[in-house]
Amino acid sequence: MVLDQLRIATRRSKLAMVQTHWVKEQLEKAHPGINISIEAMATQGDKILDVALAKIGDKGLFTKELEAQMLIGRADIAVHSLKDLPTNLPEGLMLGCVTEREDPADALVVNKSLKDKQLHELPPGTILGTSSLRRLAQLRHHYPHLIFKDVRGNLITRLEKLDAGAYDCLILAAAGLTRLGFGDRVHQLIPCEISLHAVGQGALGIECVENKPEVLEIIKSLEHEETSQRCLSERSFLRELEGGCQVPIGVNSQISGQDLILTGMVASLDGKKLIKDSKRGDKSNPELIGKELANELKSQGAMEILQEIFDSVRKD
């Protein structure tokens, strides 16, 4: 069966729309003649802006509404920032494609008062905004003299808050800044020795309905093998730790020849406990590498740290 139309579900945010239109354009180039439509909608994570993400819970926070459209037959695929896509998907859905990754690093963005400072030079009392527990824990570990403040809203809103003086600096995903045309706001890319990035950060994931080979054949034209191998190892690591995108779990992955090297981290919210290790294996079996690394961190006390975090969030 040859498809002549494809329906894409996506979030309404500006970044999501930019990413989805890119996917649409690439698919149209690869499959001339196909009619592709986009249905944009708000997700729970888009609507709740006055509560920290970690307190809401993150299972499908930015994906459930899109997945529902596919499950009832109103959409064929959904385009996600892969870091927002849970590692366990609803029955009947699958991760069909992972696109080539942008730089997955975190980025320091500063207001003009700090334009001559690098991260390690920020003075005591500097107010740093982030909504990510992963970034918070790692930066507290390395820079306990800074003041950390939650920040919500879309990327443009966050930059406006920064420029208005509500924060001295922000930590944001470099890929998101680049995709929205704010690459010039990247003051410094944070080294992975300081802040391991989120699982899947910088890549797009295209989710689709299982048992629809005609859809899978269309979207596989955007698959990037190396990115897919790296992200599958990262997602396996996260899945084995039973974590989500709102817990202090960070990763870094790279491919060297036939080997895939995965580094993973789990940290306490105050940054005082931080466990980090690496695993090397054959890139043809990326999920095994992620699972083995997770088990190694478990043996070093990772689950005890995560349980303390889950208990703390529930109390709040």
Curated annotation (Swiss-Prot):
GO term, biological process aspect, one: protoporphyrinogen IX biosynthetic process
Co-factor remark: Binds 1 dipyrromethane group covalently.
Gene Ontology CC annotation, any one: cytoplasm
Entry similarity comment: Belongs to the HMBS family.
Function: Tetrapolymerization of the monopyrrole PBG into the hydroxymethylbilane pre-uroporphyrinogen in several discrete steps.
NCBIfam families: hemC (TIGR00212)
The protein, known as: Porphobilinogen deaminase
Taxonomic lineage: Bacteria, Bacillati, Cyanobacteriota, Cyanophyceae, Synechococcales
